[in-house]
């Protein structure tokens, strides 16, 4: 009988603890970024990532150092300790909590005789498993190849063996290619051929991605033509974003309790209490130290956030590292240039508190904005307040305006009623005269029909 699935890998997690404040100066000199997380929290998240990738974690080893060893990540004594644990724990895979240099990865594999992955490779592997759309798969392959390119060494087997799928071999090291440690791959000439093939493949993929991006931009243009406000749900992975979108739209799609359950953006229509429609988009979850290759590769997908009128930041208030998760999310939003967008901070899973109220001390510790909203995507507690807040923000942006719309342009009258606030209507021989308020994004559509009664300067401005 043939096996129907790949054998489960057993991983030992390793991490260098340079989180001590006393070592901050050393880290600053080396240009490294001090993490916000404790070593225990970082390893707990790494274990969750491994579990999501289908890997069983059998143990963890840490070492306090001012900086990782350049050739082996951990020190010589710790390396011996890790090697001696192999028989006791039965691990066949080692996962490092940070992104390893090619020298560190190679040094660990040669010393331990097992495949070695780092945090970046693990996340890339999860993305490779979960990408559903053509765009998502293209983005993941670009990120994988760009990660692997500098790691092609004398022990690198032929690229054609790598492109059929990643499995858990995202690290790209010798032991992860199927050749095994000690089995030399091609010579230097073949390595150069492989590198050129990888660069050519990346160029081809990026060309394909540009075409997909152009198609997405056409979709966005059509969506803009309908002038429906957009709310982008953002937040740390597994914060409950997909559950929230499903609850808002009465969808019965299963929201998995796994990291990175959503990679491809999902957009659905939601009706506000006033009858106004909005589009709500669920985006890929963020994570601490999200690999730069993934941020770059998924930039076109993350552009959905740039299109949003409102950013809805969902935070798992019950998580022990809620503050760190919030900061990681805000950092990515800042990198995307949307940190100044109107933002609602929704504290999810409030139903897990006995009285359904966020403790004042916790809110203070998290340095939350004063106008945060407690909600439960599971029980829909706080949804009325959430929808009202969205409506309030949309109304706050409205511009007073008076227009006279020809009868032949009645679709604009419907648009005004649907997306604006009508305060007065009069019908005359020229058309429909409306006074009220409109969102700024609609002013260009109505500018030919704006009358002198419009006192607000933004309404009277000529287009640039």
What residue spans do the PLM features occupy?
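Long, well-ordered amphipathic alpha-helical subdomains in the mid-to-C-terminal portions
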Residues: 392-442
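Conserved beta-strand segments of the P-loop GTPase G domain that flank and frequently precede/overlap
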Residues: 13-17, 60-63, 95-97, 313-316, ...
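Conserved C-terminal guanine-recognition region of P-loop GTPase G domains, centered on the G4
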Residues: 35-54, 83-88, 97-114, 274-277, ...
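Conserved G1/Walker A P-loop phosphate-binding module
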Residues: 2-11, 22, 165-296, 302-310
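N-terminal accessory targeting/assembly segments
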Residues: 1-125, 454-464
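Conserved nucleotide-binding/hydrolysis micro-motifs of P-loop NTPases
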Residues: 17-21, 65-67, 99-102, 121-124, ...
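Flexible beta-alpha connector loops of hexameric P-loop NTPases
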Residues: 31-38, 67-72, 130-135, 190, ...
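Canonical P-loop GTPase G-domain recognition
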Residues: 111-164, 168, 179, 340-344, ...
């Amino acid at each position: 009988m043939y096996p129907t699935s790949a054998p489960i890998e057993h991983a030992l997690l390793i991490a260098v603890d340079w989180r001590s404040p006393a070592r901050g100066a050393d880290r600053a000199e080396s240009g490294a970024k001090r993490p916000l997380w404790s070593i225990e929290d970082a390893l707990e998240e790494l274990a969750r990532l491994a579990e999501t990738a289908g890997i069983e974690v059998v143990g963890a080893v840490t070492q306090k150092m001012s900086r990782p060893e350049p050739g082996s990540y951990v020190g010589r004594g710790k390396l011996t300790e890790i090697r001696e644990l192999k028989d006791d724990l039965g691990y066949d895979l080692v996962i490092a909590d940070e992104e390893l240099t090619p020298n560190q990865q190679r040094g660990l594999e040669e010393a331990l005789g097992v495949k070695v992955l780092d945090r970046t490779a693990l996340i890339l592997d999860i993305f490779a498993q979960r990408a559903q759309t053509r765009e998502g798969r293209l983005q993941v392959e670009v990120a994988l190849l760009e990660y692997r390119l500098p790691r092609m060494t004398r022990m690198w087997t032929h690229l054609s063996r790598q492109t059929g799928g990643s499995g858990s071999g995202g690290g790209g090291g010798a032991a992860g290619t199927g050749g095994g440690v000690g089995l030399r791959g091609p010579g230097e000439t073949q390595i150069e051929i492989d590198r050129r093939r990888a660069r050519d493949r990346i160029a081809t993929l990026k060309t394909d991605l540009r075409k997909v991006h152009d198609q997405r931009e056409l979709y966005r243009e059509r969506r803009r033509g309908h002038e429906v406000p957009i709310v982008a749900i953002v937040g740390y992975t597994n914060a409950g974003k997909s559950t929230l979108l499903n609850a808002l739209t009465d969808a019965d799609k299963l929201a998995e309790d796994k990291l990175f359950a959503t990679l491809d953006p999902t957009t659905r229509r939601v009706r506000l209490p006033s009858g106004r429609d909005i589009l709500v988009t669920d985006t890929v979850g963020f994570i601490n130290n999200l690999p730069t290759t993934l941020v770059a590769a998924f930039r076109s997908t993350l552009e959905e956030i740039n299109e949003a009128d409102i950013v809805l930041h969902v935070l798992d208030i019950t998580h022990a590292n809620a503050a760190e998760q919030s900061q990681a999310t805000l950092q990515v939003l800042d990198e995307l240039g949307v940190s100044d967008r109107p933002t609602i901070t929704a504290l999810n899973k409030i139903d897990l508190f006995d009285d359904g109220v966020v403790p004042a001390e916790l809110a203070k510790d998290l340095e939350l904005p004063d106008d945060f909203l407690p909600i439960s995507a599971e029980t829909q507690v706080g949804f009325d307040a959430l929808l009202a807040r969205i409506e309030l923000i949309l109304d706050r942006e409205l511009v007073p305006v008076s227009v006279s719309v020809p009868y032949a342009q009645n679709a604009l009258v419907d648009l005004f009623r649907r997306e604006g606030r009508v305060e007065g209507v009069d019908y005359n021989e020229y058309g429909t005269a409306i006074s009220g308020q409109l969102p700024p994004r609609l002013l260009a559509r109505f500018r030919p029909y704006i009358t002198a009664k419009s006192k607000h300067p933004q309404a009277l401005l000529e287009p640039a």
